[in-house]
Amino acid sequence: MHLARYPRRFIAHLPTPLERLDRLTAELGGPEIWIKRDDCTGLSTGGNKTRKLEFLMAEAELQGADMVMTQGATQSNHARQTAAFAAKLGMDCHILLEDRTGSNNANYNNNGNVLLDHLHGATTEKRPGSGLDMNAEMEKVAEKFRADGRKVYTIPGGGSNPTGALGYVNCAFEMLNQFNERGLKVDHIVHATGSAGTQAGLITGLQAMNAQIPLLGIGVRAPKPKQEENVYNLACATAEKLGCPGVVAREDVVANTDYVGEGYGIPTESGLEAIRMFAELEAILLDPVYSAKGAAGFIDLIRKGHFKKGERVVFLHTGGAVALFGYDNAFDYSGRWVA
């Protein structure tokens, strides 16, 4: 599959590392655990959205855009990476941030990703978390800018459309190359799934290469039927864009949404445990919104025997640790101070 046919802005630090997690493996006593470090993509603390933005921002440039616009939750990693990419290319960036948690915490609303949005020069405006179609809302705002003569390129939440998903088709190829070069037979790949683009791109790439590695997305927002439908539809559209329609079957798309908790962006006890385990055992930082819930599901499934001893499982780290600074009230380490 020849991805060089599609315009791309090479910004990410690729390939990202593939590391074995010896201490976490020993702690859980299950499969051999590896991690794909897409928290190390390089742009403004890294994260998975940079892969998508390489293709999306190249398209924006080709269309002559002088402004990009996107939307996401208050502590959106995607928004932060979009703002950073726009700064790198000399474009203006405007972001609609949806209040999905109702939190009044000052750090949640002004620190973490929000601070970096503004440091990168983006302008932001808020929307209530009342079930708005945020992509439609964004298009309304974009039309106002266009009426003033701006050339606006809009990017859907999470960068999740067929163009953005190409970034994770490429990631699938990258991982398979790493597995092959190191002689690693991988039995499963697990990651957090939200706006669908990461999982859709991965499954399209894996199926196109006949990898025969099951992919499991741990959901962070939508119920299982809706999440799987979103991923499947986007995977089909991505395969169509690539010229290989039908490469992804419905049964190839699997999501487990048992670890969402009270809702999107609201920390869970299992997610906080995952953050502590990864930090204390492997010096790896997760975020409470995406990667921690993905890791929580992964850990629980290991404990339940879903992944067997002797298997090799890769957890794809989607990044986002900067959001920890917006969730400081979720942690109490006062007992770590020694008088």
UniProtKB/Swiss-Prot annotation:
A Pfam family: PALP
Highest taxon of source: Bacteria
What keywords are assigned to this protein? Lyase, Plasmid, Pyridoxal phosphate
How does pH influence this protein's activity?
Answer: Optimum pH is 8.8-9.0.
- The protein depicted here goes by the name L-cysteate sulfo-lyase
The Enzyme Commission number assigned here is 4.4.1.25
Cofactor field: pyridoxal 5'-phosphate
Q: N6-(pyridoxal phosphate)lysine-modified residues are where?
A: 49
Q: Which family does it belong to?
A: Belongs to the ACC deaminase/D-cysteine desulfhydrase family.
Q: What does this protein do?
A: Catalyzes the desulfonation and deamination of L-cysteate, yielding pyruvate, sulphite and ammonium. Is involved in a L-cysteate degradation pathway that allows Silicibacter pomeroyi to grow on L-cysteate as the sole source of carbon and energy. To a lesser extent, can also act on D-cysteine in vitro, leading to the production of pyruvate, sulfide and ammonium. L-cysteine, L-cysteine sulfinate, and 1-aminocyclopropane-1-carboxylate (ACC) are not substrates for the enzyme.
Task: Share an example GO biological-process annotation for this protein.
Answer: sulfur amino acid catabolic process
Reactions performed catalytically: L-cysteate + H2O = sulfite + pyruvate + NH4(+) + H(+)
Induction entry: Expressed in cells grown on L-cysteate, but not on acetate or taurine. Cotranscribed with cuyZ, with which it is likely to form an operon.
- Does Transferase count among this protein's keywords? no
Subunit organization: Homomultimer, maybe a homotrimer.
Gene Ontology MF annotations: D-cysteine desulfhydrase activity; L-cysteate sulfo-lyase activity; pyridoxal phosphate binding
Q: Which InterPro entries match?
A: ACCD_DCysDesulf, D-Cys_desShydrase, TrpB-like_PALP, TrpB-like_PALP_sf
